[in-house]
Design a protein with these regions (language model features):
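Bacterial Sec-dependent N-terminal signal peptides
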Residues: 1-5
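Intrinsically disordered, low-complexity terminal tails/loops enriched in metal-binding residues
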Residues: 7-8, 13-134
Length: 134
């Protein structure tokens, strides 16, 4: 059985939208914010709110009704790159509806983070964003 991938790319500055994002879940101009102030992205068939604080990356997961969705059986990772160094961080379920991971050091301004996510049902996807540029 072939895996299907959803790839979204977010650029910073004036609204620049990759074709895959424009065709999937367009939210109008700018960035849609989640209930905790993080960027909302569609990935692997769920809505993900991405939060970065210090060394911690948190992904809060929501269903189509924007209700918290169980992350039981989810796996994920985050590739953090600042142009000079790269670090891969494992994202593990934390509580009922989140995944978390920590980098070795603070995430630099201008860093790009690529989130890879696999649901319990086997859906996979990835999204890239720059947390400090919003």
């Amino acid at each position: 059985m072939a895996a299907s991938f959803l790839v979204l790319s977010a650029a910073v500055g004036p609204t620049v939208v990759a074709p895959a994002l424009a065709q999937s879940h367009a939210h109008g101009q700018g960035h849609q914010k989640g209930p905790n102030g993080g960027d909302m992205k569609d990935i692997a068939g769920v809505h993900a709110e991405i939060l970065v604080a210090g060394r911690t990356i948190t992904i809060n997961v929501f269903d189509d009704a924007d209700k918290p969705a169980s992350t039981k059986g989810f796996t994920g990772s985050a590739l953090v790159s600042d142009g000079k160094t790269k670090e891969t961080v494992t994202l593990a379920p934390s509580g009922e509806a989140a995944l978390k991971g920590e980098t070795k050091g603070a995430i630099a301004a201008g860093a790009t983070i690529t989130i890879l996510l696999k649901t319990e049902a086997g859906k996979t996807g990835q999204v890239r964003f720059s947390p400090h540029d919003h």
